[in-house]
Amino acid sequence: MKLSIISAAFLVAITHAASIKFNVIAPNATDVKVSVNGQQVTLTASDANVPYFTGSAEVGASKTYKYVAGGTEESFDRSLDGITNSTLNDFYNRPVTYANLPQLPWPIEKDPQWTRSGSKADIFDDNYIPSVFFHGDDSQVQNVVKNVPADRISGTLTFIGSNYVYSFQNVSFGIHGAGKKHNNAKQSWNWILSGSDTMGNRNFFKLRHMEEDPTQIRERLYSDILHAMGTYANDATMVRLFINNQGFGTFNMLDDITQFSYINAKFYNGKPPATLGPLYDGASGADFLYHPGNLDGYSSWVANTANPNGEAYEALDPLCKAWNETTYTDNTAIANFEKMFDLDRFMRFMVIEYLTADWDGYWMGQTNDGAYRDPTDNNKWYFLDQDFDGTFGVNLAAPEGNAFLDVSYKDFPSRYPGAVMINNLLQNADKKATFEKYLTETVRVLFNNVTLTNRVLALHNFLLPDLEWDRSIVQQSPGINFGWTFDQVTQNLWQGVTAPNNNGGGAAFGLVEYIAAKAQAVAKEFNISIVSQPVGPPSANGTTAAAPAPAAGNSTGKGGNQSISSSASSNKTSAQSTSGASRSKTAPIVLAISALALLVF
């Protein structure tokens, strides 16, 4: 017993003497310290172009810490609970480093998840907001920002994630879709990594400005839902962007499905075959309609310039011909066509296009789609979906107005006859039954005012401090500025809002308002009961886990309640930092003595 008492005391002494490595991103700061254990310890940045400050400090008996930048101390405490060697990469004046967002359930039993891409890349971690720093020649940067040409800038890009830092040289950086007539002043951007460099098995990254959506959640949420549906949709997450140390705001970082970077990651887990299949970007008119004797009828399918053997849009002809010649009511004929085209996951995409009123997608608009032919899967074609900004009621123009949400999917074929793939597929009784099963089960457990709203509110609360920063930025490029205010970021969850600059911006539906109304309409049509508690994905034992609900928290004073405790930053401290931090030498000693104490007792 005496030995156990000595061990416990020794354990306390060693724990209190621990040295912790602190890591913080502090834009526009040069003098950064950590305040802990009654002292302020200076942190340093190894790269003058990246405000990423690190350093070690003795924590003693302290339970909390905070950062000081330019003499200004953070107004809140950060918890040291669970941190034994290094903090995550904190961001100055952001109380939550790492969240605990509720995950969505998997509503489809058959092939519930897409597994060919492997585990989710850490760069798309739901619970962390990465910071992206690009540095290039200042005159070139100023030209691109002020004059918005299609010019590319070569420079250095640093990507700071939760517990790692990636840095790349010779990165090609520029405006995505430069020169379009209706671009926003907050431009969209992209970058291409050099040579064999990759990040998360990708080399091409797109940053969407999300200016159509005051909440800046809809497009990311759409991808979240599609992943829960077991599809190969593009990954997406919010990042902060800085160009030559100037803040440009929050952006949705996502795959561009028209690039082989996306195909390599989502279809081959970073290990593509020696020869890839042809990839196509579906512009307006990309509808899968057969054009006998007129190969130019497929010109809406824009071929990727890197397609093997230079395969152009003519490659769509055999697929469209086969669909045109299929007897849609015949199960055998449908089964034969499925050897050529993945109909099952195509239906999953269509379920979500319908539920979100994706007017700028395939079913309603025959646009913003794509196609890929996979040489490793008997040359099967896969439908691709993209650009999810016109969803959940954004810019929705329908003669019924708000009553459009009551329109049944059964009316879509007559309203949107150009979508020949889904419309003809629904002529098959078995496929129609499968579609309805996917639709109703998705609404019952996921797409409703219980489960999905639970995630929306948690995500909103987590992102809110950064959205306040984003709304404060005066964009430097020419283009449309709707003038959305920070208050409208929250208001548009619950109700429609009008752009202050009266120059467009169609946010006539609140995001949660839309979800609740659409779910109720489908539930009424099919007489289904929506879950009463939020549902999560299957747990390790095979049962369906309940999703955590957003907790009440301290008011931020301006945009709602901050629901995620700042102690969430300790939830991932077991992961070893790759930014150069070394594990505290006291950790093995603590573990050994703890074990000894337990044995003695």
Curated annotation (Swiss-Prot):
Pfam family of the protein (one): CotH
Induction: Expressed during growth in host lung and brain, and during growth in presence of epithelial cells. Induced in presence of high free iron. Induced during growth in high glucose. Induced in presence of 3-hydroxybutyric acid (BHB).
Signal peptide: 1-17
Sugar attachment sites: N28, N85, N170, N324, N449, N527, N541, N554, N561, N571
Subcellular location: Cell membrane
Biotech exploitation of the protein: Antibodies against the protein protects a diabetic ketoacidotic (DKA) mouse model and a neutropenic mouse model from mucormycosis infection, and nasal epithelial cells from invasion by R.delemar, and thus could potentially be used to treat the disease.
Biased composition annotated in UniProt, kind: Low complexity: 539-579
Region listing for Disordered, in residue ranges: 539-581
GO biological process, one term: adhesion of symbiont to host epithelial cell
GO CC terms, sorted: plasma membrane; side of membrane
Domain of life: Eukaryota
Propeptide: 580-601
Outcome of gene disruption: RNAi-mediated knockdown decreases invasion of human nasal epithelial cells by R.delemar. Simultaneous RNAi-mediated knockdown of CotH2 and CotH3 decreases invasion of human epithelial cells. Simultaneous RNAi-mediated knockdown of CotH2 and CotH3 decreases virulence in a mouse model of ketoacidosis. Simultaneous RNAi-mediated knockdown of CotH2 and CotH3 does not lead to sensitivity to cell wall stress (induced by Congo Red, Calcofluor White, hydrogen peroxide, sodium dodecyl sulfate, or Triton X-100) or alter resistance to killing by phagocytes.
Entry GO MF terms: host cell surface receptor binding
Lipidation, GPI-anchor amidated serine type: S579
Keywords per UniProt: Cell membrane, Glycoprotein, GPI-anchor, Lipoprotein, Membrane, Signal, Virulence
Protein's membrane topology: Lipid-anchor; GPI-anchor
General function of this protein: Promotes invasion of host epithelial cells by adhering to receptors on the host cell surface to facilitate endocytosis of the pathogen into host cells. Binds HSPA5/BiP protein on the cell surface of host nasal epithelial cells.
Subunit structure: Interacts with HSPA5/BiP on the cell surface of host nasal epithelial cells.
Designated name of the protein: Invasin CotH3
Source species: Rhizopus delemar (strain RA 99-880 / ATCC MYA-4621 / FGSC 9543 / NRRL 43880) (Mucormycosis agent)
Lineage of the species this protein comes from: Eukaryota, Fungi, Fungi incertae sedis, Mucoromycota, Mucoromycotina
Gene responsible for this protein: CotH3
